[in-house]
Amino acid sequence: FSIGASYESAQQKMARGMAGSAVLSVKAANGAIKTDELPPLSSIEAGVGVLKGTALYHENGYYETIDLIAADLTELDKINPPHLANGEKITDFTGSLVILPDRFTLKYGINKGDTIHLQINGATVPLQAADIANYDTVFLRHTRGATALLPLSTMAGLLDQTDGYSEILIKPAAGADTAVLKNEISAALPAPAYIVSEVVNEAQIAADARQKSMPFFLISFFSMTMSVFIIYSSYKVITLDRLPVIGTFRSIGAEKKTVTRIFLLESLLYGSAGGLLGIPLGIVVLKLILHGMGQSLSQGIEIPAVISPLSAVISFTMAVSVAFLS
């Protein structure tokens, strides 16, 4: 359960990436879309226009795909503010500047103030690294490559798109239902002229998490079954080992039911001890597994361990049950 929940949490974080607290995306089927095309709905708290593009970075024989994004920083802060590595705010962000995530700059040895060259629309464009950002919010991604933030005016000039945006990200007002809001926007901006979609496909993320955790469910099931079988098949050996104890109990007048009850309490003690010791040990193993899974994801994102109280209770209950069934 914890592996699936942890992986799902990480995938949701990566999938949200640039969108942040926005839940819907609105695009024009052909060309750009303007923010004033959005209907004036009270259920919309913010509509942020975003320009998108792609570039290619070449260094020492390596090619890296760069996703370019640009937006009004004041508006972007409403849904997903970028975080600089030095903790400062983004200021004087105009001209041929670019902000890159720290994982990308560390990989290629890029420092603040360095000039990099990106191939955009077939032309080589020099850009100065204005700042280094943390690998989160708008720079977080679930595919390989990197994301770079450019000034809106610079991006518009490079893409020759000075009027409108690639998409508008919608942040709902407090208490607004996403499905209802989507229907309201779709009614005001009907298909096929506009495309209204949810930013995160929760069903797909949950399905991916189940697929990742299924092998561990099977391993746990077979391990538990084998434990019961091994202990049960060794019943005669255990009985012989307990004969002196049984004889002592019977010699002082203990009935068969009393002896059985004592051994069941012993099983309860062993099961409880195993559960209490196994849970912290399992947390350590879980973190090691998630670390390995995180390295297999693009950019090696760290998957935080998500351990719910229900998972701990189920683990403890299973430990006691195995002891009793054995």
Regions found by a protein language model. Give the residues of each.
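Small-residue-rich transmembrane alpha-helices
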Residues: S233-Y235, L269-G300, L310-S326
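Alpha-helical transmembrane segments of multi-pass inner-membrane proteins
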Residues: P215-L218, F222, V228, R261, ...
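Interfacial "coupling" helices/loops that link adjacent transmembrane helices in transporter permeases
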Residues: F229-G271
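Membrane transport/envelope proteins' first extracytoplasmic loop
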Residues: F1-T225, V237, Q295, I303
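Juxtamembrane helix-loop transition segments at the membrane interface in multi-pass membrane proteins
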Residues: E8, Q12, L240-I252, L286-Q295
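Residues that define the loop-to-transmembrane-helix transition and helix capping
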Residues: S213-M214, P244, K257, L310
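Interfacial loop-to-helix junctions that mark the boundaries of transmembrane helices
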Residues: V306-I307
